[in-house]
């Protein structure tokens, strides 16, 4: 029998110490990695529940194990909520990650050797959309589209490539693209050539749910997403699809890729979906975009840095660092020492290697969750620029770190 007195701190103090150190880092650092966010206490409570004990291969009402009557309720709640949130005909909430959701789409609609088309990773796409080292690039013939001279998606070139190569699947979505994507235009060319149209909305899902970014669901055959990032749920994946594709997608997830789903994570997803259906979540997403725009404006117009694509229409943007004679790798490290967390990121036509890069990616979801508004966003942008202007100046770094501490103290992630 387990005792409630046997806490993690008592059972495994070594791990407890590491967790507490990470908690302090999250509280004391300004998080600007676009793919990261903070979940609510309610989400964490669901994820730490007894549902972690239950094995439940299959789907609600059709399991391979007994005793699933209560986890069936939890999963159906998650399905119903995510369908309502995006206006989807059908949904699968079992993917353990966005990458596994994407693999399921490829398994459902393509055979090894088929042609797929996605956005070039070097110009803002995602590795699961055809990167040579990823299974999507190893198993399929990949045709990549990219950006035009204005660093916007080259829709004309995309259409020419689609007509020429006639891919089985056309993928829209990105991990480092700041502008709105014209999903309707993608859908038209997919329909013209008879391709499956798949949207990976992982980065934009929360914005879409709140109505601040185009919704791909009416246009796409299938839509995948993570449940963290802007959606502010636990780490995991989802798939939305037309009803006609539900059987193929469900079979691709189970038994195709996964066995028993993580029921505690599905419960946590359900909580996050409920939170996303509230007016407060819509207000949050409006602030996410406002904060990103302020940071991009300050860094670009006031501090002399080049913003890729010239602006942001979402939660994220890339910064070209070459004018400062600093690499993305070095900028990530020095900003981290000042308690500002970003990630190095390749920019279009980047001369540096992917682990060095000429740019950084900046996102506003996490800082907005802790209550930052345009006022703090402007301050943060200036702090970033201060560090980039004098990365070797210890006095500057100490001053920035002190100001970061003040901002974080005024806006804790988890209040008491």
UniProtKB/Swiss-Prot annotation:
GO terms for cellular component: cytosol. InterPro entries: PyrdxlP-dep_Trfase (IPR015424), PyrdxlP-dep_Trfase_major (IPR015421), PyrdxlP-dep_Trfase_small (IPR015422), Ser_HO-MeTrfase (IPR001085), Ser_HO-MeTrfase-like (IPR049943), Ser_HO-MeTrfase_PLP_BS (IPR019798), SHMT-like_dom (IPR039429). Its cofactor is pyridoxal 5'-phosphate. Keywords: Amino-acid biosynthesis, Cytoplasm, One-carbon metabolism, Pyridoxal phosphate, Transferase. It is found in: Cytoplasm. The record marks 228 as: Plays an important role in substrate specificity. One of its GO terms (molecular function) is glycine hydroxymethyltransferase activity. It catalyses: (6R)-5,10-methylene-5,6,7,8-tetrahydrofolate + glycine + H2O = (6S)-5,6,7,8-tetrahydrofolate + L-serine. Signal peptide: none annotated. It holds the Pfam family SHMT. (6S)-5,6,7,8-tetrahydrofolate binds at residues 121, 125-127. Its EC number is 2.1.2.1. Homodimer. Belongs to the SHMT family. Catalyzes the reversible interconversion of serine and glycine with tetrahydrofolate (THF) serving as the one-carbon carrier. This reaction serves as the major source of one-carbon groups required for the biosynthesis of purines, thymidylate, methionine, and other important biomolecules. Also exhibits THF-independent aldolase activity toward beta-hydroxyamino acids, producing glycine and aldehydes, via a retro-aldol mechanism. This is Serine hydroxymethyltransferase. It comes from Aromatoleum aromaticum (strain DSM 19018 / LMG 30748 / EbN1) (Azoarcus sp. (strain EbN1)).
